[in-house]
């Protein structure tokens, strides 16, 4: 990669995977997979285009649009669209690369991709967002389709934006097909899709608790970051299962519970309304049971916690914050966001797992812990293909099965390729990375994307 422009986010994601594979027995048993990794690390296709739209004052505005179609060996490209001023090719390549292996862990037939634009929806009128989405889809529709590439939502892209984009696609392509997921229920969407990533995260961590002998969620104190869909629905499910939610956050700061009762369902409903109006948590009218900490992430302010769930954005847990969580008694960390922990933070957690054995913290990477969102997107694709709608109970049951399989697949793969010392919990980061990876080179080899020397 030395001859290419610096892509720090993508390089971090690549190095994390490569480090895991090199430090397992996978390459000893299958040295040819080094070739597969080199091939899989380059996207099949990168589409970059301009998006020209008109603001409410009649002025011409222009943004950069992208779609990284990373790997289609397991199925159509699948991954979200992100609208945020920070969007660039490095971030989308990192997200698309992670998406390949996350999608593989679901067991569904989906490849990996990611897209978006450096457009900031904050402060924009509904009409401006509609005009931008239509202009964005005017180019993107040429490159996607129900059996080619099926985008979904991500940061800055919710049900409203998916609706505008789907309408623009339908008009441009003259087809009504399952080309986007996260659609409205009356026009091809799936029940539990908005809740899926948060619910799936909670289901996954439930298996971590059970396997390690820590019991249920009842009485556990849980720190969350973020206040979007993932954090909102994870918090609601945690409260339903008896846990105490002690924090939420956004880019302006953190809400931290000061009393024993934690953040309540009523608080979360109010936060949902704030976020629906595209406002900051600074407008939340908090009572005495929570405090607002300006400009902070929650990890060093939550006091004693049992579980930490980063659900905001990449690299939101630093080495110092990881050490702070250990000092606060945290025993479980699972990423609801993609690459939520820095490499240094992961190293802190993994070293603790090896040193403290049964008393250690247990860390789960986002590609496994947050795969519930794309899993239900895959279930939405299946429903669209059959022109059927499953009940909420049916979708939730399938989601639970997928998260259970993702957990045990990573766990058992770790036991095979990254053996733990006696009394040590298996490495879920190693197991999940390897389990997600091995499916992809096998399919690529069968399809002639790489080959071994005779």
From Swiss-Prot:
GO cellular component, one term: cytosol
Catalytic residue positions: 114
Enzyme's top EC category: oxidoreductase
Family annotation (InterPro entries): Aminoacid_DH-like_N_sf (IPR046346), Glu/Leu/Phe/Val/Trp_DH (IPR006095), Glu/Leu/Phe/Val/Trp_DH_C (IPR006096), Glu/Leu/Phe/Val/Trp_DH_dimer (IPR006097), Glu/Leu/Phe/Val_DH_AS (IPR033524), Glu_DH (IPR014362), Glu_Leu_Phe_Val_DH (IPR050724), NAD(P)-bd_dom_sf (IPR036291)
Keywords, in A-Z order: Acetylation, NADP, Oxidoreductase
EC number: 1.4.1.4
NCBIfam families per the UniProt record, alphabetical: PRK09414.1 (NF006929)
Name recorded for this polypeptide: NADP-specific glutamate dehydrogenase
Organism this protein belongs to: Neurospora sitophila
């Amino acid at each position: 990669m030395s001859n290419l422009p610096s892509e720090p986010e993508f390089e971090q994601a690549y190095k994390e995977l490569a480090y895991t594979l090199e430090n397992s027995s996978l390459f000893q048993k299958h040295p040819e997979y080094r070739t597969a990794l080199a091939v899989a690390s380059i996207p099949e296709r990168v589409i970059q285009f301009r998006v020209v739209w008109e603001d409410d004052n009649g002025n011409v505005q222009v943004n950069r649009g992208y779609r990284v179609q990373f790997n289609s060996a397991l199925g159509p490209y699948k991954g979200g669209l992100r609208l945020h001023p920070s969007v660039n090719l490095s971030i989308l390549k990192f997200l698309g690369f992670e998406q390949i292996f996350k999608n593989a862990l679901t067991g569904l037939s989906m490849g990996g991709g990611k897209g978006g634009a450096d457009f900031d929806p904050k402060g924009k009128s509904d009409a401006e967002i509609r005009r931008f989405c239509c202009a964005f889809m005017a180019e993107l529709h040429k490159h996607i389709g129900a059996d080619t590439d099926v985008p979904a939502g991500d940061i800055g892209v919710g049900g409203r934006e998916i609706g505008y984009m789907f309408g623009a696609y339908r008009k441009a392509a003259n087809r009504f097909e399952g080309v986007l997921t996260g659609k409205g229920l009356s026009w091809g969407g799936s029940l539990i899709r908005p809740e899926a990533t948060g619910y799936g995260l909670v289901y996954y961590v439930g298996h971590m608790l059970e396997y390690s002998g820590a019991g249920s969620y009842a009485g556990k104190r849980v720190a969350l970051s973020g206040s979007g869909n993932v954090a909102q629905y994870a918090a609601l499910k945690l409260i339903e299962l008896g846990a105490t939610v002690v924090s939420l956050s956004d880019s302006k700061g953190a809400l931290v519970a000061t009393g024993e009762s934690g953040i309540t369902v009523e608080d979360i409903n109010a936060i949902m309304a704030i976020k629906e109006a595209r406002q900051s948590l600074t407008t939340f009218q908090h009572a005495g049971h929570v405090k607002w900490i300006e400009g902070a992430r929650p990890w060093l302010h939550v006091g004693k916690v049992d579980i930490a769930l980063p659900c905001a954005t990449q690299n939101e847990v630093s080495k110092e914050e990881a050490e702070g969580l250990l000092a606060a008694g945290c025993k479980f960390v699972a990423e609801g966001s993609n690459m939520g922990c820095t490499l240094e933070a992961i190293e802190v957690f993994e070293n603790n797992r090896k040193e403290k054995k049964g008393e250690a913290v247990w860390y789960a990477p986002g590609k496994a812990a947050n795969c519930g969102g794309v899993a239900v997107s895959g279930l939405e694709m299946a429903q669209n293909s059959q022109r059927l709608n499953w009940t909420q109970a049916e979708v939730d049951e399938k989601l639970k099965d997928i998260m259970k399989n993702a957990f045990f697949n990573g766990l058992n793969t770790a036991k095979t390729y990254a053996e733990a010392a006696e009394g040590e919990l298996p490495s879920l980061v190693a197991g999940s990375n390897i389990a997600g990876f091995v499916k992809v080179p096998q399919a690529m080899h069968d399809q002639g994307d790489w080959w071994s020397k005779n």
